């Protein structure tokens, strides 16, 4: 008898912040839970979230997500007032928060959201401690990426 594999519909990723990896060097990554309301969970299940313009602030020993947009569904409850850009609390362990506070206080470092995804039934936010890139760093990244693509193309044609 063989065991049945668990069915995983679609991708677990809800939203990605591609600008973060383009504009910053990611030094360290953390996984944070989100404190959400019911209509927000429905929006996430429908994939209607945007974290590209969002940022994270540390206040009073807690971390908060600002600027993330969760578009409410039309079928969401009518008696609940939906605020798409509401500030959401991040759920982190004390040790992780202490590490984030120490990292964010260093000169030139910030905390950016990287991706929003499902982990089992829970919505998780991957956040990173990041240092800003200069313009020449971005150009170097583009050069290496283009060279990698050209190299793959050359190798593909060389095998023919």
Curated annotation (Swiss-Prot):
Gene3D superfamilies: 2.40.280.10
GO aspect biological process, one term: trans-translation
Compartment(s) where it occurs, according to its Swiss-Prot or TrEMBL record: Cytoplasm
Record's keyword annotation contains RNA-binding: yes
Top-rank taxon, per record: Bacteria
Keywords for the protein's UniProt record, in alphabetical order: Cytoplasm, RNA-binding
Pfam families: SmpB
Biased composition (Basic and acidic residues): 137-153
Molecular function GO labels: RNA binding
InterPro entries listed in its UniProt record: SmpB, SsrA-bd_prot, SsrA-bd_prot_CS
Chain residue ranges for the region called Disordered: 137-160
A GO-annotated cellular component: cytosol
Function: Required for rescue of stalled ribosomes mediated by trans-translation. Binds to transfer-messenger RNA (tmRNA), required for stable association of tmRNA with ribosomes. tmRNA and SmpB together mimic tRNA shape, replacing the anticodon stem-loop with SmpB. tmRNA is encoded by the ssrA gene; the 2 termini fold to resemble tRNA(Ala) and it encodes a 'tag peptide', a short internal open reading frame. During trans-translation Ala-aminoacylated tmRNA acts like a tRNA, entering the A-site of stalled ribosomes, displacing the stalled mRNA.
NCBIfam families cross-referenced by the UniProt entry: PRK05422.1, smpB
Family that this chain belongs to: Belongs to the SmpB family.
The protein's name in its UniProt record: SsrA-binding protein
């Amino acid at each position: 008898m063989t065991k049945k594999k668990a069915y995983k519909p679609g991708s677990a990723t809800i939203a990605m912040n591609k600008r973060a990896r383009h504009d910053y060097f990611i030094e360290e990554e953390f996984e944070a839970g989100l404190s959400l309301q019911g209509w927000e969970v429905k929006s996430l299940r429908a994939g209607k979230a945007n974290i590209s313009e969002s940022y994270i602030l540390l206040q009073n020993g807690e971390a908060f997500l600002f600027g993330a947009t969760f578009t409410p569904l039309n079928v969401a409850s009518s008696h609940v007032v939906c605020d798409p850009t509401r500030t959401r609390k991040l759920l982190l362990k004390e040790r992780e928060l202490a590490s984030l506070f120490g990292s964010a206080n260093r000169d030139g470092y910030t905390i950016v959201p990287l991706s929003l995804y499902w982990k089992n039934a829970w919505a998780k936010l991957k956040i990173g401690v990041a240092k800003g890139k200069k313009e020449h760093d971005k150009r170097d990244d583009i050069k290496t990426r283009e060279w990698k693509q050209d190299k793959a193309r050359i190798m593909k044609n060389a095998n023919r």
